[in-house]
């Protein structure tokens, strides 16, 4: 425990909280343009071809974003919305594309967990 005299000479330093999603700049989502759409492989022990895209955001940042769901319609110059949220087995991927917003279509034939994939309620 520091004495009052020590605290007068040198006050306590606040811890700086580092953001996990710096490119969002404290916004819930950001818009951007796809510069490259490709697949990449996850870290061990997983094996797949994960769909990701490189995005130039409106604030000038260039980030890599994961495209969730089965199948997508994104290509170069597509305008997309991204949100925070990393992909644990893809190093360097800290953002998700929002399905069903702007140029990114919702997942086709999705019946459950629809809100996460931008799908409207089906006509029963």
From Swiss-Prot:
It comes from the Bacteria. One of its GO terms (cellular component) is small ribosomal subunit. Part of the 30S ribosomal subunit. Contacts proteins S8 and S17. May interact with IF1 in the 30S initiation complex. The keyword RNA-binding applies. SUPFAM superfamilies: Nucleic acid-binding proteins (SSF50249). It holds the Pfam family Ribosom_S12_S23. Transmembrane segments: none annotated. The modification 3-methylthioaspartic acid is found at residue 89. The gene is rpsL. This is Small ribosomal subunit protein uS12. Coiled coil: none annotated. Gene3D superfamilies: Nucleic acid-binding proteins. PANTHER family: 30S RIBOSOMAL PROTEIN S12 FAMILY MEMBER (PTHR11652). NCBIfam families: rpsL_bact. It comes from Pasteurella multocida (strain Pm70). GO terms for molecular function: rRNA binding; structural constituent of ribosome; tRNA binding.
């Amino acid at each position: 425990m520091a004495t009052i005299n020590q605290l007068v000479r040198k006050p306590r330093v606040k811890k700086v909280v580092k953001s996990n999603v710096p490119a969002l700049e404290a916004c819930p989502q950001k818009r951007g343009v796809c510069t490259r759409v490709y697949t990449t492989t996850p870290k061990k022990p997983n094996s797949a071809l994960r769909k990701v895209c490189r995005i130039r955001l409106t604030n000038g940042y260039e980030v890599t974003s994961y495209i969730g769901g089965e199948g997508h319609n994104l290509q170069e110059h597509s305008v997309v919305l991204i949100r925070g949220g990393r992909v644990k087995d893809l190093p360097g991927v800290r953002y998700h594309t929002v399905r069903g917003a702007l140029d990114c279509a919702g997942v086709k034939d999705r019946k459950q967990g629809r809100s996460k994939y931008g799908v409207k309620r089906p006509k029963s």
